[in-house]
Design a protein with these regions (language model features):
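N-terminal periplasmic "start-of-domain" segments of outer-membrane beta-barrel proteins
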Residues: 52-87, 113, 121-124, 131
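Transmembrane beta-barrel wall of Gram-negative outer-membrane proteins
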Residues: 206-343, 359, 366, 373-390, ...
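Solvent-exposed loop segments that connect transmembrane elements
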Residues: 246-292, 332-369, 413-468, 520-536, ...
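Outer-membrane beta-barrel signature, preferentially recognizing the C-terminal barrel domain
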Residues: 363, 367-378, 582-589, 655, ...
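C-terminal beta-signal and adjacent terminal beta-strands/loops
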Residues: 812, 879-889, 909-958
Length: 958
């Protein structure tokens, strides 16, 4: 942590550093140019053959990436490798992080969702081999963990749009490309094995030990004589490993409490209204619960890739590819839950923005377990046919399919504190079922100190309100698409090509959320389960790297044992009728047409080329939601459940939109080494598919003392809004790029985006029949506005190899990238932000300040220092991202902010010979945690730590 904290002031000056680097590189190149002129004046000197030396490793990847960027017809950045498995990263997500302007959200310690130019994943698009790919999250991002990096050789980010690109990329489009076997041009069999180790595994009592990842790939070409040429690519991968986590977290529902009141010991704080806050009533922000969570995990992935490329004769090509990836993640969680943190809140210390920094309180304490199994399978592929009947015409068609199925089953158990233990003895330090505690936030994590008379480590003390839940979430996302493209090449004139095409796609998203619950209060049953399922705390040194932590362990129980002891079975299975009001059933049909012209000419004697086009897109949405009556079930602990009766009526909501997306890109060759690019375009970003859901979720207030069912229901939240319109953006980009030699690049880009559209929460009263009684409850959902907002940004990239230094320093090189973005976009908090009156259209002021646009980091920096000479490749990679707003995927929620973070990775490889190489890699050497706040910055929500990871690899090619 200290290393990262020291680096952050440097990062805040990253723009100045990048400019200084640019000047230094330019000066160095000027010196090189002078040396080159002097060399030309000495004809007796023998010509060098340096350019004929075969370049490999990281230097080869950088050269290939520079060449690819230079050849693009739009503003773009590319990470490319001539050979398979040569992308310099452990995963596709980590590879993308090194591309200028790209940043990732970290899950399980690795890169997941991609933000481009500081904009979240829903403002960008991601394609695999040029096609949309499904995922199991309900959003439009791509699960990069599903794709083995060893089988991908190019990742490109197109930052301006072209009419023939699939729509959706306001921020940009990420395209992952597998190798094309005929273009590869040689036979290759490759075996790649890596041993993996997470240092957090050493803390576990039941450690997984060393994991592994094995990949085998085969590429070949065949001459079929009269039937043309055939290329084949096959790849298989198996992965097994572990990703332990240590977490302190809070609930995702926050209340603005009246700071003038003294909260009684037997009740929750009183929420303030926006009108009270506007009138000067002070408030503080508090969650419904706090939880400590220890996670042991096992991860397994099997992947298979196949591609055929057939050229029966010149002018005709048929390509078929298929991908299959199945991943199973098994988690065993032990949790200590303070479930009533709105109760008896006093002696408060409050920050300027309402963040709660310290207080006393009383809460029920729960020892909980969760045995979670997630299975996710991706299947995708496509058939592409390209025909050139003559030199002037090219016709192509592409048929694709992508489907992801995710099943997530949680078996959750809870044992609560009580006035007496399992033997009937009075428990010291407890009042009723609640324990007094103090909360102090002064370190990395808050410290919670309970009454010292109450022993958190004594399992006897968790003797009440046993609850077993089986939650099952199933998601299915399918994309079917077809496109046809044609291109005509004129013999002469300004236009070098005229293109046009059509694309049809159908995306479906369905989810099912099922819960089976068993509540037990019988003391004998609870005592027997408690005694039978006790276990030692699963790890040592829990949250030892987090300053301020006060709880290192607590009484825990075997998750599967406890579930079986309470329910009588290992798995209850789901309900006979799993339908529910929260389920989603969304269908989205898209039709797109485009026409585009490519041109080449001169401007003031300088070469000019580019493209001009327009894309028309129509989107039709059909979303089905269920409405039905609910029964109230009283739990033995005094709380309630809302159980659907099974009598449902389907409501179908339909919506559509049409947009025109013009685009213009131009490239001016200022010199042989310098290019000036321009991009003007309009782009769209569709809402996530899950955000188009027509379902409803019920949020129950914590506690037991309510006079009516209406009081117990905190709110009903719409799972989405099918009428949500796409976010539109008018964009302008200018990029100046200098390519002094094969190892060097210096570029600067400025860009501007004006957004039209956004979302503001609205509250609509809806009538529900609950326990036979009509209850009117406010339903919160986002509605689309026509508000305008702006974003401006700057990108800097510098890549250089110091080949002019004396040996052995001539192998040193550096790659630096920096992105700055700023926007006045506003994302209102779902519960505490501005809200719009649906009847009048008037906006009422909220309590907390809005967040910016999803995923916006003002500063994103990536720095690589590498040493590549002979058979040795060494890399140090530092990645930094400033604070950003991160939405929850799957259902609307309040605003969450992820704090700034920086991670350091090291990689080393050695080529023993042309066939054999070995590598050693380490990630997150700074042991950087992920810390998030809600619903305002500085209001602690969660601390996740994953630890460092190490990889030892061997590769053999023949």
């Amino acid at each position: 942590m200290k290393l990262v904290q020291l680096s952050r002031p440097i990062i805040r000056n990253a723009l100045a550093q990048a400019l200084l680097t640019a000047v230094a590189l330019a000066s160095a190149q000027a010196a090189l140019a002078q040396q080159s002129d002097a060399a030309q004046q000495a004809p007796e000197q023998a010509p060098t053959t340096l350019d004929q030396v075969k370049v490999t490793g990281i230097r080869s990847s950088i050269q290939s990436s520079i060449d690819s960027k230079r050849e693009q017809t739009v503003v773009a950045d590319v990470l490319s490798a001539e050979d398979i498995g040569d992308l310099p990263a452990l995963s596709i997500g980590e590879a993308i992080e090194t591309i200028t302007g790209a940043a990732t959200h970290r899950e399980k310690g690795g890169a997941s969702e991609i933000s481009i130019r500081g904009l979240g994943p829903f403002l960008g698009s991601a394609t695999f081999n040029g096609r949309e790919a499904s995922n199991g999250s309900g959003d439009r991002s791509v699960n990069f963990n599903q794709f083995p990096s060893e089988l991908i050789n190019t990742v490109a980010i197109y930052k301006t749009q072209r009419a023939d690109f699939v729509e959706g990329g306001i921020a940009g489009t990420v395209n992952m490309q597998t190798v094309r076997p005929l273009e590869f041009g040689k036979r290759r069999v490759q075996l790649d094995g890596r041993a993996t180790y997470a240092d957090g595994d050493s803390k576990l009592r039941n450690a997984d030990g060393v994991g592994w990842r094995g990949t085998v790939s085969y590429l070949d070409q065949f001459d079929l004589r009269g039937a043309g040429k055939l290329g084949v690519s096959l790849g298989l991968q198996r992965l097994e490993g572990t990703n332990p986590e240590e977490v302190m977290s809070s609930s995702s529902t926050w209340t603005a409490c009246n700071a003038n009141e003294v909260v009684g010991a037997s009740r929750n704080c009183t929420a303030v209204t926006p009108a009270q806050v506007q009138a000067g009533t002070p408030y503080y922000l508090a969650p419904g619960s706090r939880v400590y969570r220890q996670i042991s995990e096992h991860d397994q992935r099997d992947a298979a890739f196949a591609a055929l490329q057939w050229r029966p004769f010149d002018g005709l090509e048929v390509a078929l590819d298929y991908q299959d990836s199945q991943r199973t993640v098994t988690e065993d969680r032990a949790e200590l839950n303070f479930s009533e943190t709105l109760r008896n809140l006093n002696n408060r210390q409050v920050g300027d923005n309402g963040a709660l920094l310290g207080h006393t309180g009383s809460s029920t304490v729960e020892s909980s377990t969760d045995y979670k199994v997630r299975d996710e399978q991706y299947r995708g592929g496509g058939l592409r046919v390209e025909w050139r009947p003559n030199a002037a015409w090219m016709l192509s068609t592409d048929l694709s399919y992508s489907r992801t199925e995710r099943s997530e089953i949680d078996r959750l158990m809870r044992l609560r504190s009580n006035a007496t233990d399992i033997n009937g003895n009075r428990v010291p330090g407890i009042n009723g079922q609640r324990v007094d505690y103090t909360y102090t936030y002064a370190g990395d994590v808050p410290g919670i100190v309970v009454d010292p008379a109450f022993d958190l480590n004594n399992p006897d003390n968790f003797s009440a309100a046993a609850r077993a839940r089986r939650d099952e979430l199933r998601r299915e996302h399918t994309i079917r698409a077809w496109r046809f493209d044609g291109a005509f090449t004129p013999e002469s004139g300004l236009l070098t090509s005229i293109k046009g095409g059509v694309r049809l796609s159908e995306a479906t998203y369905r989810d099912l959320d099922d819960r089976v619950e068993r509540n037990v209060t019988d003391p004998a049953t609870i005592r027997a389960a408690n005694l039978a399922c006790r276990q030692p705390f699963p790890q040592e040194d829990f949250l030892s790297s987090a300053s301020g932590n006060t709880i290192q362990q607590w009484a825990t129980f075997d998750s599967r044992c406890l579930f079986g002891a309470i329910t009588g079975v290992d798995d209850t299975g789901r309900n006979a009728d799993p339908r529910g009001t929260a389920n989603s059933d969304v269908e989205e049909k898209t039709r797109a047409l485009y026409v585009m012209g490519e041109f080449a000419s001169t401007l003031f004697g300088l070469p000019l080329d580019g493209n001009l086009g327009v894309r028309w897109v129509r989107t039709d949405v059909s979303s089905v939601g269920l409405r039905g009556e609910l029964d109230v079930v009283d739990n033995p602990d005094g709380t309630i459940q809302l159980v659907e009766t099974g009598r449902f009526a389907a409501q179908t909501v339909r919506a559509s939109n049409r947009v025109f997306l013009p685009s213009f890109n131009a490239n001016i060759g200022l010199t042989e080494q310098t290019q000036l690019r321009f991009g003007l375009y309009r782009a769209m970003a569709r809402p996530d598919l899950v955000a188009l859901s027509a379902g409803r979720t019920f949020i129950l207030e914590p506690g037991t003392e309510f006079t009516t069912v209406g009081e117990a229901i905190g709110s009903i939240t719409a799972t989405g809004n099918p009428r949500t319109q796409p976010l539109l953006s008018s964009n302008a980009d200018v990029s100046l790029e200098w390519y002094p030699n094969a190892d060097s690049l210096l570029s600067a880009a400025v860009y501007y985006k004006q957004f039209t559209g956004g979302a503001v929460p609205t509250v609509v009263d809806e009538r529900f029949v609950i326990d036979g009684t009509a209850v009117v409850v406010p339903v919160v959902q986002d509605v689309t506005t026509r508000q305008k907002s702006d974003l401006t940004g700057l990108e800097l990239t510098g890549t250089h190899r110091f080949s002019y230094l004396p040996a052995p320093f001539d192998g040193l090189g550096v790659k630096l990238s920096y992105n700055y973005a700023d926007s006045n976009y506003k994302t209102q908090d779902l519960r505490l932000g501005d809200q719009i009156d649906p009847a009048t259209g008037l906006v009422s002021s909220g309590i907390v300040a809005p967040a910016n646009i999803f995923g916006l980091s003002r500063h994103v920096f990536s720095g690589q220092l590498y040493y590549a000479i002979g058979a040795v490749d060494l890399q140090a990679i530092y990645k930094y991202r400033s604070e950003y707003f991160q939405k929850f995927v799957g259902a609307p929620a309040q605003n969450r902010y992820v704090r700034d973070s920086g991670t350091l990775d090291l990689r080393a490889s050695y080529r023993v010979n042309a066939q054999l190489s070995v590598s050693l890699e380490a990630s997150n050497l700074t042991n950087e945690p992920r810390i998030s706040d809600m619903p305002v910055p500085g209001s602690f929500r969660e601390y996740n730590t994953y630890g460092r990871r190490y990889y030892l690899g061997v590769r053999y090619r023949f």
